[in-house]
Amino acid sequence: DGLNRLLYKCPHCGTEGNMVGKGIKLTCHNCGAEYELTETGFLKADNAIFTHVPDWYAWQRQQVREELENGTYCLDTDVDIAIQVDYKAIYKVGKGHLVHDENGFHLTGGDGKLDYSQSPTFSHTLYSDYYWYELGDIICIGNKKCLYYCFPEAKGVVAKTRLATEELYKLVTKSGLSV
């Protein structure tokens, strides 16, 4: 269960967020394409486009990079927010909104009290996790003063956001662009 969190985009129809992983099956609920994860870790399917999970993931990375280069990538979702300001606990602080685009991350919430931005060059990767402590998928941004644990309402966006963070960092630092 849960392979759909990593392999979120159907290689047959291109739909995102409609992959469902149950047991050893990974199925697109848009076009019906179905893959089976074998005991040796390979994918098996009629008309299989990918037979290896890393190849599928690399294809998704390339798709995200193309969206970034074309200016069409954007994560825009409501989130539940928890923060870590010390090493004692993580505190739930309510609802907010997270945007990730060519300008980096922008998190708002707390009835206007929270407004945090993070540039694309802040980090070459993103701390993200799936079903984190059985609470949900997370995207974590922040700095040494405060970490923001964002639980997206949109499903299947965590892996894509991580890929986008990594590819955006490469694009911005390679081109020397200032964002």
What name fits each language-model region?
Residues 1-84, 98-100, 108-110, 126-179:
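Non-catalytic C-terminal accessory region of glycerolipid acyltransferases
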Residues 87-93, 97:
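Non-catalytic terminal regions of proteins
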Residues 113-119:
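Surface-exposed loop/turn elements that mediate protein-protein interactions on large endomembrane-trafficking
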